A protein has these predicted regions:
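Active-site-adjacent structural elements that line small-molecule/cofactor binding pockets in enzymes
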Residues: 1-361
């Protein structure tokens, strides 16, 4: 097999807050860094996808504990939904504070979310168009609150989907959006570094928004289905004067590894509900109902197709290379393996070392 020259730093570890306890996830990221991973993307949910053995960890708190226990690991949410339960100004403040504590090690992933994370808190679940519009405004507010001093005092007019806003001479922000209003707000503890902001997208309009406003795209598209969405993202970014080559394209393939195939297959069951048809548009927030619906409607073949189920870790090398060949810049490894510590160690010894050797060729 000819080796693709891929920097192993472009491989990251995915931490599933819905599937594991906070204590176990801390053990996993410490082991992952020790073995060679230097970045982690982690989910941000209120409810899990699955009722049986599910968890509901508060991701922002976990990131602080994880960053304290690691030395260089970068942490990014995948993704935080700025729809209802999180006000965008609070997101901006929280991640600015994280960056002050761990400068250069914090990133923010934004998305339109799922009903399971909003409806339990008393909110309605709006249509996709409304969720995207709210998310777009939230991204603008977050970026404007993070903005550096050179913008202070400059009045900005509405531009396309961008709502009227301005800063006064002391740097206080006024934002008049359709969904969010900011009145004389200022981060007194701004971020020390530029915090990368990414957006999860798979549809055309969301991808255009990602290209226009953010530093990168997070998508679950398979390599052979990615060209169209990349073209939309690149075009949107270029129209804003950005070089698409400077932006991230992020994938998160789901993997289950065990030398025993049946054990590897069984470990994928936890994610069956994420494969329900049009699940992001459904007003179902109860994990018990999601689990039951998944068992009734999602066939085993669909589960197998959605996950790389392997009994030999080397069988992951070619599929991962395919992501990079089509243009992905970073791949976060989302393992649902029956023994996670074993997976991390074997993956690092066989796969990370493979790509590390490839960079020396």
């Amino acid at each position: 097999m000819s080796k693709e020259k891929i920097d192993n730093k472009r491989l990251g570890y995915w931490a599933s807050q819905e599937q594991y306890s906070m204590q176990d996830l801390l053990k996993f990221v410490v082991e992952a860094e020790k073995c060679g991973f230097d970045s982690c993307m982690t989910s941000d949910h209120f409810h899990p996808w699955w009722h049986d053995n599910g968890y509901g960890n508060f991701t922002w708190i976990w990131i602080t504990a994880a960053a304290e226990r690691t030395k260089r690991m970068q942490f990014t949410t995948g993704v935080t939904a700025a729809v209802y339960r999180y006000n965008p100004a609070i997101i901006a403040q929280a991640f600015a504070s994280l960056d002050i504590l761990y400068p250069g090690r914090i990133g923010l992933g934004i998305g339109t979310g799922e009903a399971m994370n909003e409806v339990p808190l008393g909110f309605d679940w709006p249509e996709a168009k409304t969720r995207l519009a709210r998310t777009t405004e939230a991204i603008q507010i977050i970026k404007k609150l993070w903005r550096k001093e050179e913008d202070v005092g400059k009045v900005k007019e509405s531009e396309g989907n961008e709502r009227s806003y301005y800063y006064d001479n002391d740097g206080f922000l006024y934002f008049n959006g359709q969904y969010f209003k900011i009145k004389n707000a200022k981060l007194y503890s701004p971020p020390l570094m530029k915090i990368p902001l990414y957006m999860a997208a798979s549809g055309e309009e969301a991808t255009r928004i990602a290209g226009r406003y953010t530093d990168g795209l997070i998508t679950v598209q398979k390599p052979d289905k990615s060209k169209e969405i990349f073209d939309i993202f690149d075009k949107s970014a270029s129209e804003q004067g950005k070089d698409p080559r400077s932006l991230e394209k992020i994938a998160k393939p789901k993997i289950s590894y065990s030398e025993d195939y049946d054990k590897a297959l069984k470990a994928t069951e936890f994610w069956r509900a994420s494969l329900i048809e049009d699940v992001f548009d459904l007003d179902i927030s109860d994990p018990r109902k999601l689990e039951q619906k998944a068992k009734e409607e999602v066939p085993d073949e669909k589960v197998k197709e959605s996950t790389l189920i392997v009994t030999s870790i080397e069988d992951l090398i070619k599929p991962i290379e395919e992501y990079f060949k089509v243009g992905y810049t970073r791949v976060y490894i989302h393992s649902t393996s029956p023994n996670e510590i074993e997976f991390i160690q074997v993956f690092c010894n066989e796969v990370l070392s493979y790509f590390n050797d490839a960079t020396k060729m």
